[in-house]
Regions:
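Acidic low-complexity segments
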Residues: 51-106, 117, 173
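Ferredoxin-type iron-sulfur electron-transfer modules in oxidoreductases and energy-metabolism complexes
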Residues: 311-327, 337, 341-404
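Histidine-anchored nucleotide/phosphate-binding helix
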Residues: 142-157
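Gly-rich Lys/Arg/Thr-decorated short loops/hinges at beta-loop-alpha junctions or inter-strand turns
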Residues: 71, 100, 123-137, 258
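Hydrophobic alpha-helical positions that pack around
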Residues: 162-272, 278-285, 293
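Short histidine-centered loop motifs in beta-beta connectors
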Residues: 9-18, 22
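Short hydrophobic beta/alpha edge segments that flank linear recognition/processing sites
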Residues: 19-33, 48-51, 58-65
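Conserved hydrophobic positions within beta-strands
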Residues: 42-44
């Protein structure tokens, strides 16, 4: 019931209920929340709290798949983009449970609800996909460029902007060609080729690379007149508005020590083990299984963990690939400062985090950290900087909520 950033959904079903594919099984908990839908048809066999990623308990609904894929009645808003009323698009996106398909999984309807006093001038589709191993959006751009363009146009129609940009790294020349063909002749749409580097796909870095505008400290993309969606995000919008389908599946890269690495169209909630089985199984017992890319992903406690809306990749790593070395003392080399795309001072932030001084860490701009992993990767002392910053950011957010 916590497939997204925001207040968890409330279960609407109980053990023994029969549900259809696409049926709402969780009610939204508020504005910054989303409904949850059944990704298979079948019988509900469990409604309980379970330990998930990062050893956090989350309310879950388990459905025994009857393999019938019995859909609910679908109600599209129109047959094409131009036939859809702009005012109906954002409510449809919210009802479909659409959120970012990576990163924080931020609810799309919130992102497209422009605050009073702000103005959106352009929507950017993030096709950079800069993290190693992850190729889900690349495959989607090759196989389904039309839906990405339709989703972008629907988002533009909902917000009332005339400029849409699809940004792709220059190492994906086939995707650039496919998207250029898809936008040909459509006013206001363009495809931009970006230098392939990490973390080019990070939201703030992407906006600067495409527009030259710098999102201010503690600011949001809308502060510089921009909204950013991913390719998968745009495709899901087209599915919801033009076909009436809620977000119940996504493309996920499965790679590492598996026999046949592949991009799979996977139902939300599918256990990692079943994705691996679909790829022929493991070539050897994995030392770690990571959800997400190698730089920003999270280790799973086991491969029985279900995939979520933000699961863009599953990587099975061998011991040689994943075993970490013991931390050494900081040698003040400054490499973390040079590597940080946000211009922060990671070594100094780590000192403050180790002291547990949340106020000082916040004053040192730890909240500006985009958790890209560059500082940890470059550190010769093998200091776990990124994970400490992520934990500190979470602690600061919890303290702020308690203070309210």
């Amino acid at each position: 019931m916590s497939l997204f950033l925001g207040k968890p959904s409330t279960p609407l079903v109980k053990v023994g209920d029969h549900v259809k594919l696409g049926q709402k099984i969780g009610e939204s908990g508020g504005f910054v929340s989303l409904p949850v839908h059944a990704s298979v048809s079948g019988e509900v066999i469990g409604v309980k709290s379970q330990m998930m990623l990062m050893d956090r308990p989350e309310m879950t609904v388990t459905i025994r798949n009857d393999m019938q894929d019995e859909w609910i009645d679908l109600t599209p808003l129109g047959q094409d983009v131009d036939s859809v009323a702009p005012s109906a698009i954002i409510p449809a996106i919210q009802e479909a449970g659409i959120c970012g398909l990576g990163g924080a999984a931020f609810p799309t309807h919130v992102k497209l609800s422009i605050p009073e006093g702000k103005r959106c001038e352009a929507i950017i589709v993030n096709g950079a996909e800069c993290e190693t191993h992850v190729t889900a959006d690349h495959r989607l751009m090759l196989e389904n460029p039309g839906d990405i363009v339709d989703g972008l146009r629907l988002a533009m129609r909902a917000v009332g902007v005339e400029t849409g940009i699809i940004a792709i790294e220059d190492n994906k020349k086939d995707a650039i060609a496919a998207m250029q063909q898809a936008v040909a002749g459509i006013a206001g749409l363009s495809v931009v080729s970006l230098q392939a580097k990490y973390p080019q796909g990070s939201e703030k870095q992407l906006i600067y690379a495409v527009t030259g505008r710098e999102v201010p400290s503690k600011g949001l993309p809308i502060d510089v007149g921009v909204v950013v969606l991913t390719a998968g995000w745009a495709s899901a919008i087209a599915d919801a508005v033009l076909r009436g389908k809620p977000l119940i599946q996504r493309v996920t890269t499965v790679t590492g020590c598996v026999k046949e690495p592949a991009n799979l169209l996977a139902r939300i909630g599918t256990p990692v083990s079943e994705l691996v089985e679909a790829c022929g199984g493991y070539t050897q017992a994995p030392y770690r299984v990571v959800m997400g890319g190698c730089m920003t992903g999270l280790c799973t406690p086991n491969d029985a963990v279900p995939t979520g809306k933000r699961t863009n990749c599953v990587i099975a790593l061998t011991e040689k690939e994943a075993k970490t070395q013991a931390e050494g003392p900081c040698i003040r080399c400054g490499r973390c400062i040079e590597a940080c795309p946000m211009g922060l001072q990671p070594y100094k932030m780590r000192q403050l985090c180790d002291k547990g001084d949340l106020k000082a860490a916040e004053a040192a701009n730890v909240m500006e950290c985009v958790v890209c992993g560059c500082c940890t990767y470059i550190c010769p002392a093998r200091r776990q900087l990124t994970s400490i910053f992520k934990n500190t950011k979470d602690a600061i957010v919890r303290e702020a909520r308690r203070a309210k």
